[in-house]
């Protein structure tokens, strides 16, 4: 009975994704996000990931620096560091322990926290595969006011020269 229910759930899930996708006029967009939100959007519509920003997060100050020079920085080599060497070490401690997920550094010391990846090899393979799918002419740039986001960062984000920007904030 378990396999039957799993198959039924899979069929239902695919039908829901199809129904969601039917209303989309634009199905080949790139989401640049400072957290996992973009992955949820692609999953809801059953779309291929067209971004490397899946299963990871970037602290707001680094994210803003990345966006300021996206085309120049995004294709630079990802180098990995130990969690103890993160400039955000106080922020990532959980119960006084360092996280086990990989932390990559891109460009000029922009940290990428690969939260949902097992190891550096997996993180790098997924990043390199997905970064090639970015469509710079069809992007949605999203910021959430988490991970050291300030009102000043939100103002700077708003001033960036991107056509489609979205900011989720609880700040006034």
Model-derived regions: residue spans:
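Positively charged, amphipathic N-terminal segments that serve as targeting/anchoring signals
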Residues: 14-27, 32-156, 167
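Short hydrophobic helices that act as membrane-entry/anchoring signals
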Residues: 2-13
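Short intrinsically disordered, low-complexity coil segments enriched in acidic
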Residues: 1-2, 172
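A generic structural motif
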Residues: 164-172
